[in-house]
């Protein structure tokens, strides 16, 4: 069927459904709000699928259910249909003789997509499918738009994102994905709560952008006549709380970055950040390894997952490799001399078509080389450690080598999942790093951080030795659900206007 014919047919169906709704309005029963259900499909299947027909009939179990009518087969005086609720589907058996006069005729005029409430008794069909023999049924909500037909479905990716509500109705895989996402977040909370962390909320609007290298979204508070920035990270506020005595804190919330959109970047995304006093980046790596295994075991019951065709073993200890050594190990043709000196590193970057503005130092160039030449090769879980100080303005410098920091990033499936480090708690060193960031900003680096004087003041009151970490929830869900694009795991990703 051509598109124009599909549109014409859909418009005709909408018109017919509106006429049916008009009739119900005239009867005073368009949108009833007094139906109370007592059962969900999946719960009933879990308990009663195991019963044989005779045992189930003997129990005479009555249920009240509600859901969207997804299928229907009308066979004269009897019909089978499936209704779908938040947990699954249940078959219902509706007959003219089991309902009050006129109700069955009314039922036959309803449409797929309508939301109905039913009461009846559980039984098994000849094919042993758990079903409800209905003796009361009501139309609760009239659907004015038809569902996608069973042959064409809803496969257009952009339409799925724009009309996520429709995607969730017709695609069981989408419902399962976002249920899994909810489980991931719930298990993260349980994991941290059980270890004595306190969940907190910090501001979404900041007077200064900070806590990460990224371009912010700008806004304005009219009543206070004040320019503000949507937060790019909660880090500086969370560390203020550690100064205040909240020694183990975490936050799960949204971050906003005014940057490009890709399969791994959405301008609005969910981040877990957590901080612990009297801990180091080594402790954070051990905690991360435990958390990943906890999620795999509690949600999926496995220690091996498959991501984009690659089997990923979560049971083995996660190796650790410095950023410098990773460049060399994954690129045998590159020598230490090429990456240990500014000019040779710049030449190497140019060879791989990596832009290196004049204000880039050796540390920044090494990081760019790593991202271009190594990142996608990191399929199995690994911690990349000791990032250069130049790209780590909030990290504690390594005591043996001032060029690098006690920082790591966790990679799996060719993507960065987490970033953590021992925190810089020297206010004078932090102020100097902020000044270097200002120089970079003045040289054209739009992602460089601002100088946050109040944060320096907080450090001057004393931040205990602390380590912290941020984990991208969206990327973590991508990993566990085997999705290649971040938009697949965000309910309402940002899209261009039509």
Curated annotation (Swiss-Prot):
Its cofactor is Mg(2+). Pfam families: tRNA-synt_2, tRNA_anti-codon. Signal peptide: none annotated. Binds 3 Mg(2+) ions per subunit. Mg(2+) 2 binds at residue 416. It comes from the Bacteria. GO terms for molecular function: ATP binding; lysine-tRNA ligase activity; magnesium ion binding; tRNA binding. It is found in: Cytoplasm. Transmembrane segments: none annotated. Keywords: Aminoacyl-tRNA synthetase, ATP-binding, Cytoplasm, Ligase, Magnesium, Metal-binding, Nucleotide-binding, Protein biosynthesis. Its main location: cytoplasm. Mg(2+) 1 binds at residues 409, 416. GO terms for biological process: lysyl-tRNA aminoacylation. GO terms for cellular component: cytoplasm; cytosol. Its EC number is 6.1.1.6. It catalyses: tRNA(Lys) + L-lysine + ATP = L-lysyl-tRNA(Lys) + AMP + diphosphate. NCBIfam families: lysS_bact (TIGR00499), PRK00484.1 (NF001756). Belongs to the class-II aminoacyl-tRNA synthetase family. Homodimer. This is Lysine--tRNA ligase. It comes from Coxiella burnetii (strain RSA 493 / Nine Mile phase I). The gene is lysS.
């Amino acid at each position: 069927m051509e598109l124009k014919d599909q549109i014409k047919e859909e418009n005709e169906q909408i018109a017919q459904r509106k006429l049916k709704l008009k009739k119900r309005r005239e009867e005073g029963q368009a949108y009833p709000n007094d139906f109370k259900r007592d059962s969900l499909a999946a719960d009933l299947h879990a308990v009663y699928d195991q019963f044989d027909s005779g045992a189930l009939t003997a129990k005479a179990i009555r249920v009240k259910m509600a859901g969207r009518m997804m299928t229907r087969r009308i066979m004269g005086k009897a019909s089978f249909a499936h209704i779908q609720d938040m947990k699954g589907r249940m078959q219902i058996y509706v007959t003219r003789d089991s309902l009050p006069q006129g109700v069955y005729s009314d039922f036959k005029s309803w449409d797929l997509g309508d939301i109905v409430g039913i009461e009846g008794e559980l039984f098994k069909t000849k094919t042993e499918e758990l079903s409800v023999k209905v003796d009361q049924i009501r139309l609760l909500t009239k659907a004015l738009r038809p569902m996608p037909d069973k042959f064409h479905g809803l496969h257009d990716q952009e339409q799925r994102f724009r009309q996520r509500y429709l995607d969730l109705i017709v695609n069981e895989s989408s419902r399962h994905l976002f249920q899994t996402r909810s489980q991931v977040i719930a298990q993260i909370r349980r994991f941290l709560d059980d270890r004595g962390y306190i969940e907190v909320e910090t501001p979404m609007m900041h007077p200064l952008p900070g806590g990460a290298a990224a371009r912010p979204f700008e806004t304005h508070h009219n009543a206070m006549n004040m320019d503000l920035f949507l937060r790019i990270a909660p880090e500086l506020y969370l560390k203020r709380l550690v100064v205040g005595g909240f020694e183990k804190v975490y936050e799960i919330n949204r971050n906003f970055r005014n940057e490009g959109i890709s399969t791994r970047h959405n301008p609005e995304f969910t981040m877990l950040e957590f901080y612990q006093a009297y801990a180091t980046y080594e402790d954070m790596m051990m905690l991360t390894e435990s958390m990943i295994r906890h999620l795999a075991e509690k949600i999926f019951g496995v220690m091996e997952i498959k991501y984009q065709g690659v089997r990923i073993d979560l049971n083995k200890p996660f190796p650790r490799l410095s950023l410098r050594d990773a460049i060399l190990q994954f690129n045998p043709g590159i020598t230490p001399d090429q990456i240990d000196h500014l000019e040779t590193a710049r030449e190497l970057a140019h060879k791989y078509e990596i832009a290196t503005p004049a204000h880039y130092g050796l540390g920044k160039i090494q990081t760019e080389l790593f991202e271009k030449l190594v990142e996608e090769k990191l399929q199995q879980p690994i911690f990349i450690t000791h990032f250069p100080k130049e790209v780590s303005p909030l990290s504690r410098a390594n005591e043996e080598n001032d060029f690098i920091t006690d920082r790591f990033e966790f990679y799996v499936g060719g993507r960065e999942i987490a970033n953590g480090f021992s925190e810089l708690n020297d206010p004078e060193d932090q102020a100097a790093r902020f000044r270097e960031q200002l120089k970079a900003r003045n040289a054209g680096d739009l992602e460089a951080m601002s100088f946050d004087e109040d944060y320096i003041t907080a450090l001057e009151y004393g931040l205990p030795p602390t380590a912290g970490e941020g984990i991208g929830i969206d990327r973590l869900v991508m990993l566990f659900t085997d999705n290649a694009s971040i938009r697949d795991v965000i309910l309402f990703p940002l899209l261009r206007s039509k």
